[in-house]
Amino acid sequence: MIFAKRIFVSVCILFAGSVFAAAQTGSGSTEGIFSIKSSPAYAEILLRKTELQADIDAFGSDYTEASTKMIELRAELASLDRSLTKVLAVRPSETGKLTQGLGKLIVRKAALDADLDRSLRRYSKEHPETRRAQRRVDRFEAAIAEILK
């Protein structure tokens, strides 16, 4: 009985070691996800996304879903989610591009997207304020695209 337990424990240790070694060598497509999720850009985006989700939870009891505050928070969160999808699509060989600066650009662009959304709800597309907001968003999109190309 003791001999069987020792064999079982040895097999479990060997199995755990092989799983750990496979994770360390990065076999399969999980390597890319691990390196992307440990990048400074991902951390920056995740930090802002978490802050927004916490704000939505905190304001949920005080504001309705149709309130301006909730609409703006959700617009910024949606922009971050779209950007996060793009970041997760980066090839593992290009994770060096995922710097903190890129993360800050993406977070700032999400805030500008929310401003543009607010402007579009108030004014027409041709209004000077809306055009200004659109140009800001376009500048940040161009900077992000330049880094990721």
Identify the function of each model-found stretch.
Residues 21-23:
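Boundary at the C-terminal end of the N-terminal hydrophobic targeting segment
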Residues 1-9:
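Bacterial N-terminal signal peptides that target proteins for export
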Residues 2, 72, 79, 92, ...:
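Outer membrane pore-forming secretion/assembly proteins and partners of Gram-negative envelopes
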Residues 25-65:
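Immediate post-signal-peptide N-terminus of mature secreted/exported proteins
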Residues 9-18:
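Bacterial N-terminal signal peptides
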Residues 31-36, 60-70, 82, 86-131, ...:
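Long, charged amphipathic alpha-helices with heptad-repeat/coiled-coil character
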